[in-house]
């Protein structure tokens, strides 16, 4: 399971011109689900994303996690994170989870985060979405479980 996380000043997602999720300061989480992923990996990744200290403290050091910084998260399903890109000119997607399982684990990831006390906004699974964000820093990390 893969999370590409970006520290943002703001982020939003629209589907068919309608705003369906929006946050101020916090994390934009692009979530990719792979075939071997399961509930345990999902929970561990949620814990790791929320605990990852990439927000500045009073000394301007990355010592605060998103909750300590008072932020929210916007989670977007992103199957292309599981792409195989090591050869050729076209990505392969055979490592990605089947859509039904990917959707289940995407929803579980969001539920796990909510249960850990963070405000979660989401995109729409498998929809054609437009995601806008202001990357703060820029600060972007790839987390994989």
Curated annotation (Swiss-Prot):
<keyword id="KW-0820">tRNA-binding</keyword>
<comment type="subunit">
    <text>Homodimer.</text>
</comment>
<dbReference type="InterPro" id="IPR003732">
    <property type="entry name" value="Daa-tRNA_deacyls_DTD"/>
</dbReference>
<dbReference type="Pfam" id="PF02580">
    <property type="entry name" value="Tyr_Deacylase"/>
</dbReference>
<feature type="short sequence motif" description="Gly-cisPro motif, important for rejection of L-amino acids">
    <location>
        <begin position="137"/>
        <end position="138"/>
    </location>
</feature>
<comment type="function">
    <text>An aminoacyl-tRNA editing enzyme that deacylates mischarged D-aminoacyl-tRNAs. Also deacylates mischarged glycyl-tRNA(Ala), protecting cells against glycine mischarging by AlaRS. Acts via tRNA-based rather than protein-based catalysis; rejects L-amino acids rather than detecting D-amino acids in the active site. By recycling D-aminoacyl-tRNA to D-amino acids and free tRNA molecules, this enzyme counteracts the toxicity associated with the formation of D-aminoacyl-tRNA entities in vivo and helps enforce protein L-homochirality.</text>
</comment>
<protein>
    <recommendedName>
        <fullName>D-aminoacyl-tRNA deacylase</fullName>
        <ecNumber>3.1.1.96</ecNumber>
    </recommendedName>
</protein>
<dbReference type="GO" id="GO:0000049">
    <property type="term" value="F:tRNA binding"/>
</dbReference>
<dbReference type="GO" id="GO:0106026">
    <property type="term" value="F:Gly-tRNA(Ala) deacylase activity"/>
</dbReference>
<keyword id="KW-0694">RNA-binding</keyword>
<comment type="similarity">
    <text>Belongs to the DTD family.</text>
</comment>
<dbReference type="InterPro" id="IPR023509">
    <property type="entry name" value="DTD-like_sf"/>
</dbReference>
<keyword id="KW-0378">Hydrolase</keyword>
<dbReference type="GO" id="GO:0051500">
    <property type="term" value="F:D-tyrosyl-tRNA(Tyr) deacylase activity"/>
</dbReference>
<keyword id="KW-0963">Cytoplasm</keyword>
<dbReference type="GO" id="GO:0019478">
    <property type="term" value="P:D-amino acid catabolic process"/>
</dbReference>
<dbReference type="GO" id="GO:0043908">
    <property type="term" value="F:Ser(Gly)-tRNA(Ala) hydrolase activity"/>
</dbReference>
<dbReference type="GO" id="GO:0005737">
    <property type="term" value="C:cytoplasm"/>
</dbReference>
């Amino acid at each position: 399971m893969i999370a590409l996380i970006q520290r943002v000043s703001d982020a939003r997602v629209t589907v068919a011109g309608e705003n369906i999720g929006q946050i101020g300061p916090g994390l934009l989480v692009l979530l990719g689900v792979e075939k071997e992923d399961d509930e345990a990996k999902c929970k561990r990744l949620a814990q790791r994303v929320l605990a990852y200290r990439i927000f500045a403290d009073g000394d301007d050091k990355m010592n605060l996690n998103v909750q300590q910084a008072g932020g929210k998260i916007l989670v977007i399903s992103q199957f292309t994170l599981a792409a195989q890109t090591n050869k050729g000119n076209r990505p392969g997607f055979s490592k990605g989870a089947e859509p039904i399982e990917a959707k289940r684990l995407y929803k579980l990831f969001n539920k796990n985060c909510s249960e850990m006390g963070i405000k979660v906004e989401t995109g729409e699974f498998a929809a054609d979405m437009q995601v806008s964000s202001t990357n703060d820093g820029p600060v972007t990390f790839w987390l994989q479980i």
